[in-house]
């Protein structure tokens, strides 16, 4: 099955913004090449997780090998590597691009170029990939292929005279795409005689065989009897099996340079076979690994607590298992007086956080409370030390710290130009600095802003979508840290600090956030038998307060008339009981209260 000469191999991926029809096109290619029989076909074939199908997004990378007979009568092997399209998973995209020689750039013929497409195109150009523009959804009444071609030329600078118009849904134009892959994407370099190197572009955990690693052989060859060495983790393994995905796994004896396949070697955790790592042979290792390997760094942090403290061991086990298949997830134990035991987790971004939370609740049947997300702050101490703080509750006291720096991102927003004003207003509200504005076409504009990551991770995306009726798209990347006048905003419920509600805010916005927060808590926390004071404070200064009045039982109901001193005695007894209750009582804070912290930026 693998005796195909290198000249007849093609490795390519599909680049597209969310919802532009990437998974549908992948389905169509699998069907047209007979890789998947019609009866086995289901929509979004390569999106294996239920969550992926429901949200209509690709999270984990998939790969498929297709046999195709071209117009010249030769049979070719096409390896399609599916990529995620969301900004959180851009590292996964960059690695899958490294495993390819070409890419199909799929653009919705009615919507045009979106931010995420652009980010991935730049990654593809950095990797010197041959890019074939494809205009999808041309069967829709609103499609305007000529305008979109102009847009692609204006924004990306690609020649669109050979762009292929298609409809992945009806199959129109798909044969032309297949032929273009063969004609225009170069074959892999013929490096079978060089030392063996293979790039890991994905891995997932299989409970029976351990970690299954997807890789692309860059040079040399790998066969079943080899012992392999992973160069970044310095671990060696004996291979149990190697094979190709077509799209179900199919065992083979050997893979050579240019081919894409999988291997199983009883690897215990995904962290041992990191994406981007280089596989080489143990007895004849390569001199140096392939370039570009970096460990995925979490950008967004939040606390995860089980609603029932008995579930804490289950949560630990679930996170351990998730980490086996998601090496970007980081976590450590955390305790809080208000919430009990839980974990502080780090994620690539907000979508990644939501997906992990949803997978924990779905696949492991856990009830979770999630605290507001925060970012990593750099704190410069008076004694010259520098601390990295990812949990607002652990921020040192003002007397000990000299300054706080927060991460900034450079953001590009693509939108129709009638939404210019509202988008600029949104960026201004979020402490954004205006950098530039470019007109791509007469109707579409690019806004470039630099803003604090903390302002982006809450609900910036939702706000942007709702203000532009869903037409805007954005892309951002980290540009470094900047010093700002930041303060720690504590929330006290019944004179007790609620750590999970602590946030770090800019001094100018602290008052409105604090006021909004206590007002929101007043609505959300149920009334108790005693009065609950709610306060927002910066250090020892209370900047906003509200109180939830007590529920009152009428103790005088049974005194019809009677002596006033009797009534006073009963009221005094009630007041005494309430005082004791207040000293002893614990206030349960509902999950909505923690999420309220997130939503406050809308109003502040």
Curated annotation (Swiss-Prot):
Catalysed reactions listed for this entry: GTP + H2O = GDP + phosphate + H(+)
E.C. number(s) listed in UniProt: 3.6.5.n1
Domain tr-type G: residue ranges: 7-189
Location, primary (coarse class): membrane
GO aspect biological process, one term: translation
Top enzyme class: hydrolase
Record GO terms (molecular function): GTP binding; GTPase activity; ribosome binding
Binding locations of GTP: 19-24, 136-139
InterPro entries the UniProt entry points to: EF-4, EFG_III/V, EFG_V-like, EFTu-like_2, G_TR_CS, GUFP, LepA_C_sf, LepA_CTD
PANTHER family given in the database record: TRANSLATION FACTOR GUF1 HOMOLOG, CHLOROPLASTIC, TRANSLATION FACTOR GUF1-RELATED
Described function: Required for accurate and efficient protein synthesis under certain stress conditions. May act as a fidelity factor of the translation reaction, by catalyzing a one-codon backward translocation of tRNAs on improperly translocated ribosomes. Back-translocation proceeds from a post-translocation (POST) complex to a pre-translocation (PRE) complex, thus giving elongation factor G a second chance to translocate the tRNAs correctly. Binds to ribosomes in a GTP-dependent manner.
Record-given protein name: Elongation factor 4
Species in which this protein is naturally found: Prochlorococcus marinus (strain MIT 9313)
